[in-house]
């Protein structure tokens, strides 16, 4: 399971984020999505810790904490399928049904 880290400074690096979370245990992976057009960090990231206990400790300590001039939003990351409706399938299914009903 991963940790979602939001409201990050655009100056953050994977190394600096790793250092903050390393205070709460072993960091397995840090991911900072980048904007395709600008190449700039998008203001959020994901951190994977060594154990659930380490994740819980990091979330409890860092959620709402100020870092690099920003108040962090830190919680368990939701799997892609649980984050809400996907954009692609919603419109596609509806148009196929309308086509069948008309002809």
From Swiss-Prot:
Protein name: Putative RNA-binding protein RbpB
Keywords: RNA-binding
Pfam families named among the record's database cross-references: RRM_1 (PF00076)
Gene behind this protein: rbpB
Basic and acidic residues bias (residue ranges): 74-85
Superkingdom of source: Bacteria
Source organism: Nostoc sp. (strain PCC 7120 / SAG 25.82 / UTEX 2576)
Key word RNA-binding present: yes
Gene3D superfamilies: 3.30.70.330
PANTHER family: HETEROGENEOUS NUCLEAR RIBONUCLEOPROTEIN 87F-RELATED
Molecular function (Gene Ontology), one example: RNA binding
Positions of region (Disordered): 74-103
Low complexity compositional bias, start-end: 92-103
InterPro entries: Nucleotide-bd_a/b_plait_sf, RBD_domain_sf, RRM_dom, SLIRP/GR-RBP-like
PROSITE patterns the record matches: RRM
SUPFAM superfamilies: RNA-binding domain, RBD (SSF54928)
Domain RRM: 2-79
């Amino acid at each position: 399971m991963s940790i979602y880290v939001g409201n990050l400074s655009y100056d953050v690096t994977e190394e600096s984020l790793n250092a903050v979370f390393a205070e709460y245990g072993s960091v397995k992976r840090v991911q900072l999505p980048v904007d395709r057009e600008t190449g700039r960090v998008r203001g959020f990231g994901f951190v994977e810790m060594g154990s659930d206990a380490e994740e819980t400790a990091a979330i409890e300590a860092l959620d709402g904490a100020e870092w690099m001039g920003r108040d962090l939003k830190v919680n368990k990351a939701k799997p892609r399928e649980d984050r809400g409706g996907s954009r692609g399938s919603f419109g596609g299914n509806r148009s196929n049904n309308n086509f069948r009903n008309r002809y």
